[in-house]
């Protein structure tokens, strides 16, 4: 037998196992694939606290394999294709009886990216609940559990056609903490890069602290965030992927590791960098940050990055893009429509000439945004069911004020379909400078932080603008909100 009570840690695990035994007997739905028992990491054909302990050791890097002979497949309880903190969270929920069975999703079908030539124009905002590829192409998901597969498809399409493909976790990621800063070191194929993130700690609350990650900086009211007992982490995004202008493509520490010819826009390199930061936080308890309670925010171009980071990493509990403009919370189709109506708004055709935020693969959609098999309402939906608060300023037409409203409305419909409408908010208030964050929006931000980072009951139901915008549903959607 693998487990011997040789130390206190194993003894505690045993006691927890005993305490959960009644709960486990009441939960027989541990699904098997041939001889595979999902969640059974030590090969004893049971799922218990010992398996939870093994999962923790694996995520902390203390072990690289599981002793049960089932490999890592049994640990991938959300069927996402990777083992991460989400799997550990589901395993905990199963042991506590808050979910009925494992795995929590359906096996993911390999996603075949369609060719540009095969894409069919669609002037409306695509249905976030309809599969676009594979054997289920043209069919809608019929249960919440299928969102895992649909989410993976949206993510793959967005990376292939817009952002660039985010590489998997580097071969080695380490973290070290000193002088209120965590240094992250990533190694791949004999190359290494490092970057440091400053941490500002609150004077209230208890360690390990929840934290808001600021992309390059934090343009919200940081003093109010600290008062809530939430730490602030500054992520040096421009070090990872430069974006001074279009000529910055291929520059930054990401490209030092993967090569300057890697077709990635700056935003996806930032998402990769925050992935590595979270990996480092998970293995560096000296940093006194709770890696399960992380938010991300950024203003303007950094807001585009914040949305991409939250969309592509499910470990982010709360995403707050602020006045992010087109390529952020403003969609490509809706921006084109606003431009066609005579307003001076940034569009896809313009943005690809301004900077290197996106991969070169996006260029082929210039003048043909209707061929995109997704749009940014679906990018926002990738955050579901996690928290998303869209902070906007209607005074800046260039940022796609109406476009953002339309895109956010469609994204909220996706949240409604998934049964969590209050997990996404939209707040658009003018009368101030770009990314100045007026005091009138602070209660909304506070509510979202309280709910998603502090675990408190807060009213997060907000969808408002101080402009009289209306959503032309007949123009933008030809799909309905599902009921699961």
Where is each model-derived feature located?
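Cell-envelope and extracellular/periplasmic
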Residues: 282, 323-327, 355-356, 384, ...
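Cellulosome-associated attachment modules in secreted, modular CAZymes
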Residues: 2-108
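Alpha/beta-hydrolase-fold serine-hydrolase catalytic core, especially in secreted/extracellular enzymes
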Residues: 108-196, 201-207, 384-388, 393-484
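Loop/turn elements at helix/coil->beta-strand transitions in domains of secreted/extracellular proteins
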Residues: 207-212, 228-232, 290-293, 314-318, ...
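Cap/lid segment of the alpha/beta-hydrolase catalytic domain
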Residues: 214-285, 325-334
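Primarily recognizes the serine-hydrolase "nucleophile elbow" in alpha/beta-hydrolase
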Residues: 277-339, 368
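Mobile cap/lid helix-loop segments that gate and shape the active-site cleft of serine hydrolases
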Residues: 321-379, 400-408, 414-421
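Extended catalytic-interface subdomain
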Residues: 269, 297-299, 321, 359-361, ...
